[in-house]
């Protein structure tokens, strides 16, 4: 009996040692790019049923490596700074030039573009994004672009090796602010809930190898879900 108790104690100690606590902390130190600007010049449906987008980018260099890349512990794009494109709050596509084509499903689509650092942290200033929509004709009512929106950006996809240690949690707010007294973002990571009241990037630590589920919700001061399109949003990523 003593031997069984001994091995059980060892198992509990070993299990606890291998279960790390999930934490969420502010990520600080990135260049701010407060003068960076992204504006849409044109978008046209081409003969291949894809959209051709043309942007004007000011005070920001696409393709450059952002200061801090490679030393801040975050997954980084070797292709440098880019534009994130999010359609209907789905996973973003990254674009490294100011002109590109993208296939988009027919029907009503809400599309957000914003400038991104090479390690996928969004540039958060009033001129660094463009919000638009396609479709919304006939009986399909268009989106109200003045509504409050929460867009999910990171984490995304598959993380390997050292990139699994620290995951960037980043989202984009449009037509709303978050604060201790006002709206907030509720982030749930593998069942652990965090209430966010400051729009800054964060990083997640303490995750185990395997599948990670991240859910983001825009909530009001009473903790109630705000009834706007694509809220809440949930995403799964994999750590290998």
Q: What role is predicted for each listed range?
A:
Residues 19-48, 136-161:
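Short, compositionally biased P/S/T/A/G/V-rich stretches that sit at domain boundaries
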Residues 92, 116-125, 194, 219-228:
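Short acidic/polar inter-strand loop motif in beta-rich domains
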Residues 46-53, 65-71, 161-170:
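Short coil/turn motif common to extracellular beta-sandwich-like domains
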Residues 51, 55, 105-117, 171, ...:
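Short, well-structured beta-strand segments within conserved domains
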Residues 83-85, 183-187:
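Short beta-strand elements bearing conserved aromatic residues within extracellular beta-rich modules
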Residues 12-15:
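C-terminal motif of bacterial Sec signal peptides marking the signal peptidase cleavage site
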Residues 89-97, 191-199:
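Short beta-strand segments within Ig-like beta-sandwich modules, predominantly Fibronectin type-III
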Residues 39-40, 57-74, 156, 171-177:
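Short amphipathic, basic-aromatic surface patches that mediate peripheral association
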């Amino acid at each position: 009996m003593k031997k069984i108790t001994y091995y059980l104690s060892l198992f509990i100690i070993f299990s606890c040692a291998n279960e790390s606590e999930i934490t969420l902390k502010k990520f600080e130190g990135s260049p701010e790019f407060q003068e960076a600007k992204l504006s849409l010049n044109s978008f046209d449906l081409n003969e291949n049923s894809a959209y051709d987008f043309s942007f004007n980018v000011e005070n920001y260099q696409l393709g450059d490596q952002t200061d801090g890349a490679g030393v801040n512990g975050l997954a980084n794009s070797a292709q440098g700074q880019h534009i994130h494109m999010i359609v209907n709050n789905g996973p973003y596509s990254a674009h490294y030039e100011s002109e590109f084509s993208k296939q988009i499903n027919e029907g009503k689509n809400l599309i957000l573009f914003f400038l991104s650092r090479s390690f996928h942290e969004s540039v958060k200033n009033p001129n660094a994004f463009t919000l638009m929509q396609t479709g919304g004709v006939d009986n399909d009512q268009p989106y109200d672009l003045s509504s409050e929106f929460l867009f999910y950006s990171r984490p995304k996809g598959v993380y390997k090796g050292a990139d699994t240690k620290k995951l960037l949690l980043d989202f984009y707010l449009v037509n709303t602010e978050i604060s201790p007294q006002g709206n907030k973002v509720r982030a749930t990571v593998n069942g652990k809930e965090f209430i966010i009241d400051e729009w800054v990037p964060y990083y997640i630590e303490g995750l185990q190898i395997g599948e990670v589920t991240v859910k983001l919700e825009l909530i009001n001061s009473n903790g109630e879900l705000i009834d706007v399109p694509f809220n809440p949003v949930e995403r799964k990523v994999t750590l290998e």
